[in-house]
Amino acid sequence: MARKMKTMDGNTAAAHVSYAFTEAAAIYPITPSSPMAESTDQWATQGKKNIFGHPVKLVEMQSEGGAAGTVHGSLAAGALTTTYTASQGLLLMIPNMYKIAGEQMPCVFDVSARALASHALNIFGDHSDVYACRQTGFAMLCSSSVQEVMDLGAVAHLATIKGRVPVLHFFDGFRTSHEIQKIEMWDYDDLADMVDYEAIDKFRAECLNPEHPVLRGSAQNPDIFFQAREAANSTYNAFPAIVEDYMNQVNAKIGTDYKLFNYYGAEDAESVIIAMGSVCETIDETIDYLMKQGKKVGVVKVRLYRPFVAEKLVEAIPDTAKVINVLDRSKEPGAREPLYLDVVNALRGTKFESCTINGGRYGLGSKDTTPADIIATFENVDKNEFTLSIVDDVTNLSLERGETPVTAPDSIVACKFWGLGADGTVGANKNSIKIIGDHTDKYAQAYFDYDSKKSGGVTMSHLRFGDDPIKSTYLINKADFVACHCAPYLTKYNMVQDLKDGGTFLLNCSWAPEEVGEHLPGQVKAYLAKHNIKFYIIDGIKIGKEIGLGGRINTVLQSAFFKLSGIIPEEDAIKYMKDAATASYSKKGEAIVKMNHDAIDAGAKAIVEVPVPAEWADAETESLFVEAKGDNKPLVDYINNVQNYVNGQEGNALKVSDLMPYVDGHMPLGASAFEKRGVAVDVPSWNPDNCIQCNFCAYVCPHATIRPVAMTEEEAAAAPAATKTADMTGMPGYKFAMTVTVLDCLGCGSCVNICPGKKGEKALTMAGLDSQRDQQEVYDYGQKLPAKEEVLAKFKADSVKGSQFRQPLLEFSGACAGCGETPYAKLITQLFGERMYIANATGCSSIWGGSAPATPYTTNAK
C-alpha cells in the first residue's frame, strides 16, 4: 500500500496518529512534548475529524498531575483519552497511571522521553522518565525514528483498545521528537480499518453510567487485595500477542517487518548490541559500514519493552552470538540499569547463558552517540559495566573511541548552519528541509542543536539530504557545507573544521572580500587553504536592514544556501521559498510577506566568492579561549577549566575528573561576567549633552549592561581616552558617566526607547558594535572605581535614580534581548541582594538564572 510522503518531526507524527484514535485529550505542556498537544489543539480548533467523525475535545489543566487525573476520569466515563508529556511531567502522572492500568482502561500516553532533574536540570533526551514507570502496569512501546513513531503509534492505540492494557508509547526527546524526516503518513481510513470496534463497545458498556451503575476505586483489605492483583496476569500474558498481531497487520498494509524484537545485521554475528530508541538508527548505519569490512555484528532493537517477552528476545538473537552488549539510556545509581538486568534475566537458562553479557550507559541528557561509540561497543569484550561518549578518568568505566568515520551512504549531503538565537536561522532551515523533502524525490533530515540562552545564544542546524534513507541520529561532524550566520562566532568556535575536503563555507559578514582575511582567525584561514574549501561571503545584515527586516536574516541566507547547494533549480527554489514565507508570515500582513520575498530575491544575488590565497595555509593558530585571572580562585578555576570549554562548544572534551568539584551541581557565582559574547549588531552610544541623568536606561536594562558611574575629578582625569562625562547633577565635584559593557549587551534598544533626552533629542542612540568597542574599556574602568558613599546618601535606594547607583547582583543573563522579567529581578538584587535567599521554580527564570556553564547571579566586594 502506497502512502503519502510528507516532511515532519516526530512530535507531529505522534500527534497525527493519536488524533485519529482520540476522543478527548487532557494536556499540560512540558518540553519536549509540547508540540504534540499544540498540534492536537490546533487541529481540533480547525474542526479536523478523528476516525470516529468528530474533532477531539481538548482541555488544558493546571499541571501534569491534573492532566493525568482528567485522563483517568474521562476514561472512566467511556471516552478514548490520551495525553502527551515527558520528564517530571510524566512523574507527576504516575499515581494515576497505576489506577488507569489497574482498572484496565484503554489509553495511550505519548512520551518524548527526557532526562529527570538530578544534580541539575536537563531538558534533553534519555530514558530516565520512562524507566520510572516500569512498575505502573502500563505497557511500554518504543519507537526509534520519526517513521516508527508514525507506524508504531498506530500499533499502540490499536493494541490498547483490544487488549485493555494502557500503553506508554515513547521515543527519544529532541533526537526523535524534534528531528524532521521525510516519512510515509497514515491515512485515517486505513487506521479505521484495523480498529476492533467490538472492543470499544465493550469498554464503553463497562464504564460508569447511570444506566448500569457500578462502583470503582474501592478499598480492599489484606484478605483479597493480593489475589485481585494477580488476577490481572492473564491480561498481561495475552497482551504481547495482541501487539504482535497488530504489528503483522501493519506490516501487511505497508510492507514493514515490525516485531516485538527486531534483529538487524549479519546472520552469523558474533558481537550483538541490544538497545532501544534512536541509537538503533545509528547502530544500523554503523553495522552497514562494518559489514562491508567483513565484521560479524548485529543489533536487537527492543520494540515492546513492557511486558518484556523473554522468549521473543531469545528468538531474535543469532545463534552465533558470543558477546552481547546491552545499552541503557539512563543511570541507576548503586545498581545496574533496567534493560541490562532484563536481558541478563531473560537469557539465564537459555542457549545464550554462556555468552558474555555487558551493560553500558549512553546518551544521558542527549549526549551525542556517534558511530565511533558504536564501533567501540561492538569491540568491547571484557568491560562488564561501561559508558559511552565520555572520558571517565575517575571510575574508569568509559570505552575509548577512535575518530568517527563517515558511515552514511555516499549520496548523503550534510550541511551545518551556525546561527544566533532568534535570528531566524532555525526557522529557515525547517522550511528548507521541508522544501527539499516535499519537492524532490530525495530523503531529508533536519535536527537543531541549541545552547540554553533564551535568545541570542548559539544555534546549530544539522541538515542532511540524499538518495538513500537517512539513519544518522547524531550530530554532523563531517559536512559538505557549513554556514556561519554570525561573524563573531569565528573567534569563539571551531566550525570550518567540520568541513570535508573540497566543501563549501558561507560567511555572513559586513566585510569586503579584500578585507576578510584581516578578520579571520589563523586556524580558519589555514583550514580553508589546506582543505581546498570554497569560500563565499554575504552581507545579510545590510540586506535585512535595507529591506526592513532588521536582524531577521533567515530568508536572505536561506536563499543563498539554495543558490550554492544546487539541490533544486534556482527558480524553483525561489518559488518554494516564497510560498513558505507567505504561509509563515501571511498573518503579519502583506508588507511583511513582501519584505521576505524581497529578501529571498536579494539573497540569491548577493553571494560573493572569496579566493583563498595559498599562503593562508601557513597562518598560525589563535586561542579561542580568554584565560580568566583574578583573586577568586574557585571562580577563576571554574572559568578556565569548565566554562571556557562549554562556551566554546568544546564541553564534550571535558573528563569526569574536570566535573568532580561540581558533582552536586553547584556553580560559582559571577561566572557570566567572563562570557563577553559580543553578539549584538548594534549597542547604545551615549551623548552626555542630551542626558538628564535620570538613570531610566539602567533601570530598564534586562541584562545590567548599561550602568551609571560617579567619578571624582581625579578619577575622570585618569579615565580611558574614550570616556565621556558630564558634571553630575546635584553633586558638585563629581563627574557622571553612563557606561556600557558592549560585549555583554544584546542590543535590544530598551534603553534608547525609555530615554527622555533633552529637547526631543535622546541621549542614547544605537550604533554598530565595532564603532563602540572602545567603550568596553570605559565600562571596565568604571566598575573598578569605589562606590561613592556621598552619592548613595544623596540618591536613596528607593528611587529609580538612586537604585541604579547600587550594584546589581544579577548581570549578563541568558534572557532574551528586551526581556521584561529580568529588570525586576535585577532591581530586587540592587535593593535587597546582600540578604537574599532565592528559590526558583522551573521556567524561564531558571534557565536565564541558572543555566550551565554561567550563572548571572553574582556577589559584591563584601
Report the location of each language-model feature.
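Thiamine diphosphate
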Residues: 244-391, 462-464, 479-481, 501-554, ...
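Ferredoxin-type iron-sulfur electron-transfer modules and their immediate structural context
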Residues: 573-574, 586-745, 752-862
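Conformationally flexible catalytic loops at phosphate/diphosphate-handling active centers
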Residues: 52-56, 167-262
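A short, small-residue-rich loop immediately preceding and capping a beta-strand
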Residues: 24-29, 56-59, 74-92, 106-111, ...
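Anionic-ligand anchoring segments at beta-strand to alpha-helix junctions in alpha/beta enzyme folds, i.e.
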Residues: 24-60, 253, 267-268, 272-303, ...
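Active-site cofactor/cluster-binding pocket
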Residues: 4-10, 307-312, 321-333, 411-421, ...
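Conserved thiamine diphosphate
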Residues: 123-173, 197, 352-363, 530-535, ...
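Structural signature of the thiamine diphosphate
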Residues: 140-202, 366-403, 595-618
